[in-house]
């Protein structure tokens, strides 16, 4: 690849949206028009290039975010196609972490849907500049202006409309470019590859003028010189408008909104122009946060080829031909095949073997990669998602990624002894690929338990185990990942003493356990368990205090009510005692565990269950039955809103009550209603339900 691969020529973007908004189709069209794909792949025919796993082609949904490199004008665009199904939000989360910009695809009929909100919040968390593409403008009921309003109302976003649709529904034929003030019309017979510009027709002139004025009002605020020019009645040039749209997009002052129909091949080239004109290059982002290993100091590192090498591993994938592939985003410096780097999170050296540029599931070998690139490395031994690879002499750890807690679990058993060993290998490989998927062993039953983000998530894991690793397994019924917490503060003073000839063990700890105030948001890792030491005067020597924290952290995995992990509490070590000879880190670890066992029952412990935010879209006539059914599932209705000729019901419902809901909804609505759900928060289980759960344990 030639040296135009310079930082300002690169765009690392994600394409993210709600399931079925047409995201993969949009990506397919981008690959087609940038010359990467010689034939258009249709999702509903199971032929999309980006959806390369067998399950994806069967189900018509994108599960793993395939990374693809293509070119437009003189720019290189690295695209991560992310899944829109709620069970795969982890894929979205980790791709957003390494992107510089994103395109949010909205369904022109449905507008902002629950998963659109989730993705938007995730993009906010990583400060990803983005633009919106209102897709499916050719569909019955498509309403561009309503989508723009929903961006304001539902997401609190500040949309900047830079295009208007020409024609509605099946008569949609092009767009008005509000920067150039021209109409762009596509020729149907040329598969969208040919289009022409013309003057705005008289019947749309007023609307175009109105939106052009709104656009100018918003962008001139970013530049005093242009503002003066505008206010004094001088014309603001198209180049000035473009520069200011780019400036505002990168600073998240607003979000440009475009429209089109990817399926009907309209609006994709202007979307590509907008990606290269308005979304940031790595140099616009400028820095990446991290920690210098030698000093432990947090600092901002410049994104530059001239700096020492630093990259973040954001995805592991098993490729049937190459083996394990680790996708990395290089933030600074460069690497060549044969170089040795260090994984600073695990403190292990890794030798760089094959380096690949990926086009969906085709691959191109490269010998060198540098800052701004997204490449796949073959054969790394110890690197997992979220790890940093760094120059050996100047080591850094880049900002870590956070992964959500799983909310559902299943027991799996191999069907035969031959499957036993293969299953262990398969599950550990799949867990390395996907941090939101966990594997553990139930100590009481000896069963292997797999945990994930939803029924579909685990279904696909089991399917992959069968197809890719040829493992046959028996699957148990899904179980809810309950948690436990305390509701009042309690104090425990515990002494651990063991004397049996030779060296003994001695440790005394006095710990206050108290509930963390906000139980609601489990997404913030800090709220699960907080430990603090208030030891004064060396009652417990400094070197023993980590033993107390380690003991509590281990024991909290088995709560005191029904053995579920304990969360949302703080433990403060306030006093203690030690013995010069008999005390050790281990003795304090044992004392902390025993203090937990004795102290927690005094804190009025309660069971917590995951609550899901459920959104049901249904024709009017089934509303009553559907609401009645949600109420019977201990659901709390949050809102009911009309959307086109349908009703949207939003409710908070315990996950335990939602198993098999898809079949119930189908029969209640004769298959006409649809639903989606996302994890909302953990809440206390009502006492009569808690008794049943305890009895089952």
UniProtKB/Swiss-Prot annotation:
One of its GO terms (molecular function) is GTP binding. The keyword Protein biosynthesis applies. Keywords: Cytoplasm, Elongation factor, GTP-binding, Nucleotide-binding, Protein biosynthesis. The keyword Nucleotide-binding applies. One of its GO terms (cellular component) is cytoplasm. One of its GO terms (biological process) is ribosome disassembly. Pfam families: EF-G_D2, EFG_C, EFG_III, EFG_IV, GTP_EFTU. It is found in: Cytoplasm. SMART domains: EFG_C, EFG_IV. GTP binds at residues 17-24, 81-85, 135-138. Its main location: cytoplasm. Gene3D superfamilies: 3.30.230.10, 3.30.70.240, Elongation Factor G (Translational Gtpase), domain 3, P-loop containing nucleotide triphosphate hydrolases, Translation factors. Residues 8-283 form the tr-type G domain. NCBIfam families: EF-G (TIGR00484), PRK12740.1-5 (NF009381), small_GTP (TIGR00231). HAMAP family: EF_G_EF_2_B. Catalyzes the GTP-dependent ribosomal translocation step during translation elongation. During this step, the ribosome changes from the pre-translocational (PRE) to the post-translocational (POST) state as the newly formed A-site-bound peptidyl-tRNA and P-site-bound deacylated tRNA move to the P and E sites, respectively. Catalyzes the coordinated movement of the two tRNA molecules, the mRNA and conformational changes in the ribosome. Belongs to the TRAFAC class translation factor GTPase superfamily. Classic translation factor GTPase family. EF-G/EF-2 subfamily. This is Elongation factor G. It comes from Rickettsia rhipicephali. The gene is fusA.
